[in-house]
Design a protein with these regions (language model features):
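N-acyltransferase acceptor-side catalytic subdomain
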Residues: 1-182
Length: 182
């Protein structure tokens, strides 16, 4: 599902800029739901896949997608990178190019370069100073607190278990499982 087609720019010392690009033959694992687009293409007799995706696989984290060494001319390299991505899209005959979860600054730069921005919503929870989950629950009214506790009890009673792992804690088996999920 994620065929790497990264764009890189080099000088005599090595890579100076890159864009993480993937050919996608489905929309799983992106956290952006474009099934309606794929369906519309199909109804019009067009092919939606493959598409070119600029993203970090399996994560909806906003971050830079125009990866440029700090000692380089950012403006010039941004143009070269976006031109290279457009050329790659033509070479691969993709239906479209999707830059996912770019920073506000990069979104503005890509829009200025003539790309259409994607507008979507993402919800974030900010800790308002709670020291524990119990502190968070204590700030809720009784009905909300009771509903959350009931939902968590149902999950536990169903035998569902979960654990948190950061990247360096994930084992090769974990990574294989993550990949199968998407």
């Amino acid at each position: 599902g994620w065929k790497p087609r990264h764009v890189t720019l080099h000088n005599q010392n090595g890579i100076i800029a890159a864009v993480p690009c993937y050919l996608k033959y489905h929309s799983w694992g992106e956290f952006i739901f474009d099934w309606a687009w794929a369906n519309a293409y199909d109804q019009a007799g067009l092919t939606y896949y493959p598409k070119l995706l600029i993203a970090v696989p399996f994560t909806p984290i906003t971050g830079s997608r125009l990866l440029i060494q700090p000692n380089q001319d950012r403006t010039a390299l941004q143009k070269r990178l976006t031109d290279a991505v457009s050329l790659l899209a033509e070479e691969e005959a993709v239906s479209s190019v999707h830059w996912l979860f770019t920073t506000e600054n990069e979104t503005a730069q890509l829009t200025q370069a003539g790309l259409l921005p994607r507008v979507s919503n993402q919800f974030h929870w900010d800790n308002a100073g709670y020291d524990s989950f119990a502190d968070f629950l204590g700030a809720l009214n009784a009905k909300k607190r009771k509903n959350i506790l009931r939902e968590r009890r149902r999950v536990r009673d169903a035998g569902i278990r979960f654990s948190w792992r950061t990247g360096h804690e994930a084992t090769p088996t974990d990574w294989q499982h993550f990949y199968r999920c998407y």
